[in-house]
C-alpha cells in the first residue's frame, strides 16, 4: 500500500551548504499494519510524512501510496490518505460538525453519503456531545478528535499520524492510540510517527528507527531485540544511536587524516 525506495530530501542553506534531511530511506507498509517511525526531534520523520502526503517533493527516490506516485499522481495520493498531526489548525468559528462536513465536501462526497459518514464518525469517535461546539471553545482532546474525523471523513485506505499525541494529556493520548488500533483492525494502512518509545512498543507491528535522516534499523520489536541482543527497548534505541554517531565520528576522522 505504501512503498518508499531510496527517498532523499536535500535543502540548500546559504550558510551551511547542502543539508540532507532524509537520506536514502526505504520501507513499505501493508494494509492492516501499523508501521512506526521512531526518532528524536529532527530525525527526519516529519519530512518523510510530508513527502508521502505530497506537501514536499523528494530530491531523489520513489514513493507510492495506494499505487500512486507522490510526484506524478499527487491528486490521487491526496484522495487516498488522511493526515493527522499535533498542530492541525482548527477554525474558531466553525463547529465540529461544520468542520468535518466542510472537508467531506472538499473531497467531493455526495450530500447523503457525507451525512451518513459524519453520523458514523461522530458516534465512533464519541463526538456527538460537542458536535455543535465552535473551535474556540473546544478542549485539546476535542480538537484532536476533530482532526482525526476530518482525516477519516472520505474513508481513505491510508492514514498518517505525525507526532499526533504530542501535547495531549494522558487520557486523550490513550484514546487516540485506541482509535489507531481500531483502524488497523478495519484493514487500514497506517504510519505512526513519534519520539515516544512506549507508544511504538504498545502499538506498532513494525518499527523503523530514524536518526539524522537515516533509518538505522527496522523490524518487529522481537526482531530488533533479538538482532541487538537487548530486551530493554530504550537501551536498544540509545545504543543504536550511539554506535551510529561513533561510526560517523570515525569516518570523519579518517577523512580528516587523508586530507
Where are the regions a protein language model picked out?
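Conserved ABC ATPase signature
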Residues: 134-138
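Conserved ABC ATPase "signature" region
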Residues: 101, 105, 112-130, 178
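Conserved catalytic motifs of ABC-family nucleotide-binding domains
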Residues: 155
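A short, flexible loop at the N-terminus of ABC-type nucleotide-binding domains that lies
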Residues: 1-4, 10-24, 31, 73-74
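ABC ATPase "signature
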Residues: 218-219
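Catalytic Walker B motif of ABC-type/P-loop ATPase nucleotide-binding domains
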Residues: 159-163
Amino acid at each position: 500500500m505504501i512503498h518508499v525506495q531510496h527517498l532523499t530530501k536535500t535543502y540548500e542553506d546559504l550558510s551551511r551548504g547542502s543539508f540532507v534531511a532524509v537520506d536514502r530511506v526505504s520501507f513499505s507498509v501493508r494494509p492492516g499494519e501499523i508501521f512506526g517511525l521512531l526518532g528524536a526531534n529532527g530525525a527526519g520523520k516529519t519530512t518523510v510524512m510530508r513527502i508521502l502526503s505530497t506537501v514536499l517533493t523528494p530530491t531523489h527516490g520513489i514513493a507510492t501510496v495506494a499505487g500512486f506516485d507522490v510526484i506524478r499522481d499527487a491528486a490521487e495520493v491526496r484522495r487516498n490518505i488522511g493526515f493527522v498531526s499535533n498542530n492541525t489548525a482548527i477554525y474558531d468559528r466553525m463547529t465540529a460538525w461544520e468542520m468535518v462536513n466542510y472537508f467531506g465536501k472538499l473531497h467531493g462526497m455526495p450530500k447523503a453519503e457525507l451525512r451518513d459518514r459524519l453520523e458514523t464518525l461522530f458516534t465512533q469517535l464519541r463526538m456527538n456531545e460537542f458536535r455543535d461546539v465552535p473551535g474556540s471553545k473546544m478542549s485539546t482532546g476535542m480538537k484532536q478528535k476533530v482532526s482525526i474525523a476530518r482525516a477519516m471523513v472520505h474513508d481513505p485506505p491510508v492514514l498518517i499520524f505525525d507526532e499526533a499525541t504530542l501535547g495531549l494529556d494522558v487520557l486523550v493520548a490513550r484514546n487516540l492510540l485506541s482509535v489507531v488500533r481500531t483502524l488497523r483492525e478495519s484493514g487500514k494502512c497506517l504510519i505512526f510517527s513519534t519520539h515516544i518509545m512506549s507508544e511504538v512498543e504498545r502499538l506498532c507491528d513494525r518499527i523503523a528507527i530514524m536518526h539524522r535522516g537515516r533509518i538505522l534499523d527496522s523490524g518487529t520489536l522481537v526482531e530488533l531485540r533479538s538482532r541487538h541482543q537487548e530486551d530493554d527497548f530504550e537501551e536498544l534505541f540509545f545504543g543504536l544511536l550511539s554506535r551510529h554517531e561513533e561510526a560517523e565520528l570515525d569516518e570523519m576522522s579518517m577523512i580528516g587524516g587523508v586530507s
